[in-house]
């Protein structure tokens, strides 16, 4: 029996269009990102008017929290929930509003989408646990395991999980170390050894042949996991992320970027920390990236955090992959430079098959994780999995 009720669940749709809502590229992206899960055009007018002229995170979060409360008062639950998530996204880790706002978002979304408590599990891992949701159709045609990246709460992705569940896939969402509840509640910090949480999830659910998808930073982590976990038979990098450090340093405006590269490359810790302290005052994107990176790694300084993220690369292990692989990228991704798509392609020298897809402005899918036309991305993944047919089981071990 389908383990995600009910017949009263709201219809899920994904709007098409990337909108100019704020002149700051980072804020504008996040406004579009969370609108993309709701699709209520009234959000566009509300957000554009409310954040006009706002150029600091404290005021931005105050305004978005107010929009969320107003939406909930009007019983616009999905809109209100994602407004809360949008505001929480920019709240620093020490803010007392952060965890309560996160929990309200989760509770509201689960209730609105009619997600039954029985689909939720806590998977033992290290000194803590990993949260997971399993959404199973009546007659599954395969298993899809999904995780996020640098800043994700997996609940945000539930509308997409419903899409794949309704397409016939036994769909499992989980958070690994440094993500969502695994970080905030179980206190597990980010680790590049992603085959370990994937192994824990596959063991817990007794799975032997899956498609594994990672989104955002997860597009690099999924390559790492697939290199060492043979039960991963198909791989989706949504989007590619073969070099996380390059993406992080890209958030530094030029020409300071070159100076930071030089200081970091020479191992000058004091110079890196001093430079970052000054640079974040000039870049909202960098301010957020450093704040989030320190939070999800549990490290104390920008230098330590950048050294940690230097380990998040795929060039050294990509040749180990022998699976079917789908790589995706946005032509105008402001986090991940587009050259990382061919970079990743050239290192996958032993895969069974390789499909790469670059999304463009003409499709309104040119941005990170195809924000602006996420439905197109989800349909592509579904078509790719369908086209490959059923996964062949591995021979039984003697």
Residue ranges: model-predicted function:
Residues 321-322, 327-329, 333:
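Short beta-strand/loop motif that positions the catalytic acidic residue
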Residues 227-306, 329:
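Hydrolase active-site cap/lid region
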Residues 160, 323, 337-347:
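Short alpha-helix in the alpha/beta-hydrolase fold that links the catalytic acid
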Residues 164-181:
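Conserved alpha/beta-hydrolase
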Residues 91, 360-376:
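Catalytic histidine-centered segment of alpha/beta-hydrolase-like enzymes
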Residues 156, 187-208:
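Alpha/beta-hydrolase active-site loop
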Residues 64, 94-139:
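N-terminal cap/lid segment of alpha/beta-hydrolase-fold proteins
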Residues 346-366:
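Catalytic histidine neighborhood in serine/cysteine hydrolases
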């Amino acid at each position: 029996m389908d383990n995600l009720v009910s017949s009263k669940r709201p219809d899920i749709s994904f709007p098409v269009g990337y909108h100019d809502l704020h002149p700051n590229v980072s804020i504008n992206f996040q406004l579009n990102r969370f609108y993309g899960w709701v699709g209520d055009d009234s959000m566009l007018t509300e957000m554009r008017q409310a954040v006009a002229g706002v150029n600091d995170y404290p005021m931005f979060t105050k305004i978005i929290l107010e929009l969320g409360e107003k939406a909930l008062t009007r019983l616009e639950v999905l809109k209100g929930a994602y407004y809360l998530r949008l505001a929480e996204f920019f709240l620093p880790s020490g803010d007392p509003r952060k965890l309560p706002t996160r929990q309200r978002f989760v509770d509201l979304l689960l209730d609105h989408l009619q997600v039954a408590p029985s689909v939720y599990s806590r998977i033992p891992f290290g000194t803590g646990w990993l949260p997971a949701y399993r959404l199973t159709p009546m007659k599954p045609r395969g298993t899809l395991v999904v995780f996020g990246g640098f800043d994700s709460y997996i609940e945000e992705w539930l509308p997409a999980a419903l899409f794949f569940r309704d397409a016939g896939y036994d769909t499992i969402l989980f958070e690994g170390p440094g993500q969502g509840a695994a970080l905030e509640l179980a206190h597990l910090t980010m680790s590049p050894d992603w085959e370990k949480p994937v192994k824990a999830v596959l063991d817990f659910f007794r799975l032997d042949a899956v498609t594994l998808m990672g989104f955002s930073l997860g597009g690099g982590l999924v390559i790492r996991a697939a290199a060492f976990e043979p039960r991963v038979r198909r791989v989706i990098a949504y989007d590619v992320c073969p070099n996380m450090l390059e993406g992080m340093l890209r958030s530094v405006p030029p020409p300071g970027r070159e100076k930071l590269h030089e200081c970091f490359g020479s191992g000058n810790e004091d110079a890196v920390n001093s430079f970052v302290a000054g640079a974040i005052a000039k870049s909202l994107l960098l301010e957020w990236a450093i704040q989030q990176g320190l939070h999800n790694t549990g490290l104390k300084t920008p230098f330590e955090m950048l050294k940690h993220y230097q380990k998040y690369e795929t060039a050294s292990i990509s040749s180990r992959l022998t699976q079917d692989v789908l790589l995706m990228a946005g032509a105008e991704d402001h986090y991940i430079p587009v050259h990382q798509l061919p970079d990743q392609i050239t290192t996958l020298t032993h895969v069974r098959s390789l499909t790469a897809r670059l999304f463009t402005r003409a499709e309104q899918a040119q941005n990170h994780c195809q924000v602006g036309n996420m439905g197109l991305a989800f349909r592509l993944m579904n078509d790719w999995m369908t086209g490959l047919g059923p996964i062949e089981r591995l021979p039984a071990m003697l």
